[in-house]
Amino acid sequence: MRRLPIRPLAGLAGLAVLALTGCGTQTAGAPAGPGTDGGDRTLRAQQVMRLTQPHEQTGMTLLEGPVFDKDGKLLVVDVTAPTGEPKVLRVNVRKKTSEQFHTDDRGNYTSAQFSPYDGRIYLTDFSSGDIVSLAPDGGDPRTFFSGEIDGAPMNPDDLAFDREGNLYVSDSRGMSEGEAKGRVVRIDRSGKDATVLADGLAAPNGISFDADYRGLWFSELTQNRISYLLLDEEGTVASQHTAIRVDGGIAQTDSIAVDADGNLYQGLHGRPAMAVYSKNGERLATVELPARATDGLESATNVAITPGATRAYMTVSGPDGGYLYTFDALAEGVRQSNGG
């Protein structure tokens, strides 16, 4: 999700502050920017298609949460879509066509991921604090979780599932006030038991399990850092530490995806690009657009890597509209790089 000081999300009724980030890297043809840490390899992304235009009612469009369904179609959420326009789109990346998958009169959805437990697709609604689920065909909407956790409502941003189907959510509570009140929350797969795993965080945004499900990576938007939560067998925290400090310049950390080799793909709001790190914190590469394509684009919020292959699709947005771009990832896609 993107951050107010870089681009305010004005005109969204009932939406306090949506912080929707992009990806920070060096611009094509320019010297490496801050935070390259020797990772001077460039993964060049190419445009697939424009999916959305800025909405008249909200003044912008912001794509997020790309996730492949079982038929190989790519689902994408449009965070700022008003009532009556597609809030989740289904894309045929081969034919370069899209269609409405879901819309409603309530949600500002910031992420999407299929549950390994019931096969439904789960969406985080940043505005209401709810987590909703849909049938695989986009129908049968249900509220999976709603209400306060430890006396405070959520602003759920991204989500990740463990192997059993329990949810782990980045809660950006406190972001609109500029206060470090954010949390990482675990919700059991029944939706009845919610536990705070970490708190006092600065607008947590991206969240993903590592390649072997031993722990969680999560990013903090306003601190430009990635932390690691080592989990025990019960899914609670064994330890927590700052793992990577991202020198993004004007860019801020957004969503995280993890490939089969454990590499992290970190979105940075403020630049339409993405930074790639190893699990040991080494900067490996920068995903960037051709220089001619960067005008009118401000963020590359998230990425889905094709399961079992290396073709990756990232969501890129700005005043010029919402786009899909593609590049070759460093390793194959797995669940941790498919939604969230």
Q: Can you describe what each PLM-predicted range is?
A:
Residues M1-G29:
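Secretory targeting and sorting signals
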Residues Q57-G72, E85, D104-Y122, I149-L167, ...:
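Beta-rich, blade/repeat-based domains predominating
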Residues R225, R245-E282:
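Loop/turn-rich, solvent-exposed surfaces of beta-rich toroidal or solenoidal domains
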Residues P86-L89, D130-V132, G182-V185, R225-S227, ...:
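A short loop-to-beta-strand structural motif that recurs across blades of beta-propeller domains
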Residues S299-G340:
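Blade-level signature of beta-propeller repeat domains, shared across WD40, Kelch, NHL, RCC1
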Residues T80-E85, F126-S127, M175-G182, L221-N224, ...:
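Short, solvent-exposed loop/turn segments at conserved positions within beta-propeller repeat blades
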Residues G33-M60, Q240-H241:
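A short helix->beta-strand "capping" segment at the edge of beta-propeller domains
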Residues V91-K96, A135-G139, I187-K192, L230-G235, ...:
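Short loop/turn segments that connect beta-strands within beta-propeller blades
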